[in-house]
Structures are given as structure tokens and as C-alpha cells.
Amino acid sequence: VLLGRALLILGLLAALVGVAAAVRAHQTDDTRLLQVTRRLVLAVTSLALLAMLLLEVAYVRDDFSYALVAGNSSATTPLYYKLTAVWSTQAGSLLLWLCVLSVMSAFVVRGAAVAHRHLEPIVLGVLLTVCAFFLFLMVTYASPFEASPQGTTVGAGLQPLLRYPLMALHPIALYIGYAGATVPFAFAVAALVTGRLGSSWLVAVRRYAMVAWAFLAAGLVLGSRWSYAELGWGGFWGWDPVENAALLPWLTATAFIHSSVIQERRGMLKVWNVSLVAATFVLSLVGTFLVRSGILDSIHAFGASTLGVPFLVLIAVVMGASVWLIAWRRPLLRSDHRLDGLLSREMVFLLNNVLLVGLAFVVFWGTFFPLISEAVTGTKSALGPPWFEIYTAPLGIGLVLLLAVGPSLAWRATAWRLWMRTLRVPVALGLAVGAVGIAAGVRTPSTVVVVLGAFVVLATSAQELWRAARARSATSGARLPSAAAAVVSRNRRRFGGYLTHVGFVVMLAGVAVAGASSSGKDVTMRPGDSVSVAGYRVHYERPVAEVRSEKITFGARLGVWENGRRLTTLSPAREYYPSLDSSKGTFGRFFDGEATSEIGIRASLGRDLWVAASPDLQTLRSPIDEANRRFATVPPTAQALIIAAIAERYVVRAPAVTFRVIVRSGVSWIWIGAGLMGAGAALALRRPRRGRFLPGRRRQVVSR
């Protein structure tokens, strides 16, 4: 515990000295001070990683002298969850934030030392300032190295809802996204301070922005999957305040990635780009603040704490400094060119940004409306999912339509007839698919438009690849597949973007179809009973009970039939974790602690069958009370036998179970679309190959 505190204090001192050295290095252009700053960045990184390693070792060794370990782990917690439990707590998540940011800062040291020497002092100074902020919080407000009360030998265990494999990765992905947004912000501040506001800083942050964007997207998708497979309500996005807070920086980062292309190519939107970078960083801080402040109710929040005030101060300082710097450098942020034509790729990018920022505003307003309404009227009123869906759906449809037409437009200006000729095949395909959807029973106009648009995007992207490959084949003599591979290899950013767009619209189409085609019911059944939902027959075959050291599971074995044919077997269950409340009795605490749902899902490309079970344990109340009275003092081995006997009674007596059965189309396409987005981002992040041989009629070097 003392060693961990010492590491944090040393890290804070190193960060503060590094900030001072960075400022002085900028003022004097002293390379020795800059070298000191670089070394201090690496020192902060090393100290942060050592602190994380120390905490991980404490979890693995069940060292309950650490309050964090005692409160969030136990001897029976599986190793995987011990390793990931570190960031399930407020203090541990701050340490994770610091580790991710410091590692990224070390990468900046490695890259900026050669390519961006003039920006480096301010960049490192900003990064170290943010590191110092998180170190200050851990030293003064929420230390991960607090000691447990004397004599603590038993841990409380990990919060049951977090015992889901993907949920352990969800915070890491989000924090890489949040911390990744700090790097573009640091470069933007450096560009504003130094007055070097060309495209060089954009080139420097391009990969960091893409990494942050990709991991924010991954975090959002992992959280959605957890909600769908674990929470027991049947949905994948509930417009929860903390979910929305993670979505906000992703939207502004998406806008920046697109608008930065215009500045690189045409020298336009300079004010807009630095504003988007600042907004993305501020919204990342807002997301981190919201989960810790307790000001809005959320299943994801840590609860009320004193950390809200420091975060509000930092957010206010960042916003004020950003506005002042942009206003100060406004003369240097004038665009080099004007928009040449409305029918151009620049115009599509601009409209894309307007819609993305509009979406961010709608989500921000809806998320913080309880606070706004309380401030104005004195009454806290929340806006539910229907409100969000009403106002976000038109903007989402607009994005799909822009993605459908964007690739077919040229930079600066496009002839109307040429554009129409280019869009003929994609639009015809989209209309045909829309007609098929209507014939299949899809009646929601927005769903038809999104699905139609998704196919137009797919067809437009495929057409762009085919045209580029055909041109390459004609000049090189290579076969078309080889030429296509060469084109993609040399233009990974472009075609990675196309693949990401395809994944995005596929995901949106899945969301639209899932929202328009859900049907289900709640039904109470006993073994032998059946229920029919949307063509499926779900038959309750028998109850299931399982006793493990860390939980007791009560569930059901269900047979799923369609058109007289057995499709699969599902085993939805409810898992009960022991309570530490001794007032519930020696045995009662095992059956009356926190419970989570294990969902039975039969997934397919067409539709999902989703089943949750809620067993009635009232029939076990009598044997539990009797065991509490008669066997409260028996040894642990005897307790285990009695608990197993009580659980077996559930199987023998087979009480009624309430099932929630939902059939929803399109859900699998959400995860497929997310996978395509990830593949597109990975392709765009890979550096293009140069000077490679193309297979064909003769070996030929691809010219630069």
C-alpha cells in the first residue's frame, strides 16, 4: 500500500516538473530541457505501469489488506475477473486512464522527436498536465492504494453484472478512446500556441484520432452487446446517460476525421477542426466526469463522489483556454480556399459534419435535460428513449444518404449528368432492395430508407473499387483481382474508409430493422408448458440448478421448435451471488444476494430468439429458514451439502418460472456491421505499400 502511494506521489512530482520543463523549453528553445521533458514523460509512464502492476499482483494474490481488493474481489473470483477487476472501481479506473494516457504520451515522444520538433514542447506539456491531473486525483481524492481495516480476510467479490467476458474489455476500449482524444487536443493547442496552423499538425494526429475513434466505437459496441446478453431487458441501447456520454466524443471525433481531410486537401475548415478536436477532448472529460459525479442516474455510474468538482474545474479550464486560443489565432485560421460548387465532395463532407454535430447536440440535450429542467423549473424531468429516437432518426437517415452519394462526387465540382450516370446502378440496386423489403412486410418508411441507403452505399463503394481496379488492370496488365488488391494496398486510407462506411450503414440498417420488427411476451410456465412467439415454439423441458463456490444458478432447459423441426436448446438462467449481510442467515445469504440474468439466445442472420428466465424461489423459503434455524453453526463442508440439497429441491419441486421471450430481426447485422467498421479502421490505419510488384503479364514496378 505504501509503495503504491509512493509511486503515485513520485509520478505527480515528475509530471509537474515535466510541465515546467516543457514550458521553459518552448520559451527558450532549449533542446536540453526538451530532452528532460521527454525523459520525465517516460518516467511518468514507468511509474504508472508499476503502480498498475502492483495492484494487479495484489488482486491475483488475494491481498485483502488493499481496500480495493477487499471491496471488489474474493478468493473464489476467477483469475480473469481478478485481473480485470482493477478498473471496475472508481480509483482503479483513474489509474487505467493514467496508464493509457502515459503510454500514448510515450509514443508521442517517440514520434514527435523527429517529425514535429517545433510542436513537441507544448504537446508534451499538455499531456503531462492531464497526467498530473489524474495523479492529483489519486493522491488526494480516490487512491487505489487505501488500506483495509485491520483484520480484513474476506473479499466482497466482483459486482455480478461485471462478470461478463466482454464487459472486462469494454472499459479498456473506452479509456483508450478517451485518452486517445487527449493527443489530438495537445497537438491542436501546440499549433495554436506556436501559430503553425497548416496541415502538419493534422498529419501528426491522424493516426491517434483514428485509434481513439476506433476504440470508442469498440467500447460502445461491447457495451451494447453486454446490455443485450446480460441485463435481461432485451435491448442493446437504452439511451442511458453514461452510454450517451461515451457516444458524444465518438460523434465529434467522426466529424473531425472527415473535416480534417478537407483542410489537408483544400486548406478549409481550420477553425472548425480545432474546435472539433477541443470538443472531443472536453466530451471525453464529460464522459469520465458523468460516471463519477452521480448527478444523473445510470446503471453504469460509480455513484456520488467528491470527484465531480475537480472534473468540472478541468472542463471549465479546457473550454475557456480553447475558446481564448481560437479567438486569439482567428486571423491565422482563415480558409485558403472557398467552396467551389454545391455538387462536390467538400459539400458532402460539410453536410456530414453538420449532421454529426447535430446528433451530438441532440444526444447532449437529451442526456442533460434533467439538470436543465431542474435549473429552469425546479423539477427534474428525464427524456426517455422515444424522444431520442424521434430526433436522432432523421439525422441518421441523412447520414446514410450522404454516405450513399459521397463517393461518386469529385473534389471541387461535379457535372450533374456525370453524377447521375455514376449513380444509376447503385440507386437501381437500392430501389430494388427497398421494393423487396416492402414486399416482405417492412412498412416503416424510415427502415425502408435506411436499408435502401445501405445497399446504395455498398454498391457505390464496390463500384469505386471496380473502376479503380479496372484502370489499374488496363495500365499494368494485371488480372482484375490482383489489380484490386494492389489498388487497396496502395490506397488503404481511402478504401478503409469505404469499408468503414459500409459497416456503419449495415449496423444502422440492423438497428432500424431490429427496432421495427420486435415482438415478444412475458409468460409463466411449468415443465411441459409451451409458448409460441413469431413462428417459434418454446417448450419448457425441465428445471436446472447448479451450485458453485461463487454462485448458485437456477434456470431452465428449453427446446426451440419452428415448423415442426427442433432448432436448438436454450438454457436461460438466473445466477445468485452470496450476500455479505449476515442478517439474512447462514444459508439465506446464498439465495438472497445480487442476481444476474444469463440469457438464452438463438442468433441467426435473419432474426434472434432471446429468452430470459426469472425463477420463483418462494418455494425454497421454508427450507432456507429451517436451515438457518437448525444448522447455522455447522462446518463449511456441511453447509455446502445443505446448500446443494436446498438447490436440488428446486429441481424436484419445479416451481413456476416467468420467461421473457423476444423475437427480433436484424440484430446480428449490428454486430456484423461493427466488425466491418473495425476491419475498415484497421485497414485505414495500416501504412500503404510502395514500390511493390504487380502480378500480370509482365513484372512491373508500381510507380509512385
Task: Label each residue range with its predicted role.
Residues 1-704:
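Solvent-exposed, non-transmembrane regions of integral membrane proteins
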